[in-house]
């Protein structure tokens, strides 16, 4: 795990969950965060490789980093305003 992932302020384990559950959990978690805080998402659903980046773009959050070469996938997002 690179430093960006290890320094996340919040962590969400979505392993074993299938679409649409991971994105629903991300949305719920992000709502409880302050603007600028970071969230590490760990998932193994292949749909997250498309859904998490789309969620960030649609909701004006920043996808700081992602590792999707193999499972578990990791995503680091920063909450927007």
From Swiss-Prot:
Entry's Gene Ontology molecular function annotations: sulfur carrier activity
Cross-referenced Gene3D superfamilies: TusA-like domain (3.30.110.40)
Top-level taxon of origin: Bacteria
Subcellular location: Cytoplasm
InterPro entries: Sulphur_carrier_TusA, TusA-like, TusA-like_sf
Gene Ontology terms: biological process: tRNA wobble position uridine thiolation
Swiss-Prot/TrEMBL keywords: Cytoplasm
Keyword Translocase found: no
Recorded GO CC terms: cytoplasm
Keyword Oxidoreductase: no
A Pfam family assignment: TusA
Principal subcellular localisation of the protein: cytoplasm
Positions of the catalytic residues: 19
Record function comment: Sulfur carrier protein which probably makes part of a sulfur-relay system.
Family membership noted in the UniProt record: Belongs to the sulfur carrier protein TusA family.
Protein name as it appears in the record: Sulfur carrier protein TusA
UniProt source species: Shewanella sp. (strain W3-18-1)
Gene that produces this protein: tusA
């Amino acid at each position: 795990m690179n430093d960006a992932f290890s320094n996340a302020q919040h962590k969400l384990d979505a392993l074993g969950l299938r679409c649409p559950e991971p994105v629903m959990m991300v949305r719920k978690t992000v709502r409880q965060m302050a603007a600028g805080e970071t969230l590490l998402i760990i998932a193994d659903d292949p749909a997250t490789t498309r859904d998490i980046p789309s969620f960030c773009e649609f909701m004006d959050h920043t996808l700081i980093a992602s590792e999707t070469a193999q499972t578990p996938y990791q995503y680091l997002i920063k909450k927007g305003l």
